[in-house]
Amino acid sequence: MKIIALDIGGTAVKSGLVDNGVLKEHRETPTPAAEGGQAVVALAKKLIAAYLPEGADGIGISTAGVVDSKSGSILFAEDCIRGYTGIQVKALLEDAFSLPTAVENDLNAAAVGEAAFGAGKGCKSLLCVGFGTSVGGAAVLDGRLYTG
């Protein structure tokens, strides 16, 4: 399974193509945060389109801000990306590319990744703390991402 993955942060957008769990390609591009949320989505579309010739089964987005992971919309992110709040990332990308898309908060995604593949592999619970453009944290308790 091939997944186009993007990590949208306040200063950089990291993108890559993951093929059966192996990162095959990787790019890093400055985030146009000062230009606003629509510019960030436009950059995401451009990066995704660049990977499409390789083939893809889906899109995975981790992003700064408070995210409604069910709808894939940004509930709040004004502190890091102006005008990002309210953007429905999942719907915009699914409409543009006709690929299933998942959107999650960046620290939640990092915690799940660490639990499955990284420092927390084999642990029942873990706390993941991130320091970057902003500060955040996420917890995996009894093997499940704790939200709410």
Regions found by a protein language model. Give the residues of each.
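Short glycine-rich, Thr/Ser-proximal phosphate-binding strand/loop in the N-terminal lobe
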Residues: 2-42, 74-76, 145
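Short glycine-rich anion-binding loops that position phosphate/pyrophosphate groups of nucleotides
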Residues: 11, 64-67, 132-134
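Short glycine-aspartate micro-motif
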Residues: 3-7, 56-60, 126-130, 138
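A short alpha-helix-loop-beta-strand transition element characteristic
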Residues: 55-56, 148
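Glycine-rich phosphate-binding loop of actin/hexokinase-like ATP-binding domains
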Residues: 121-148
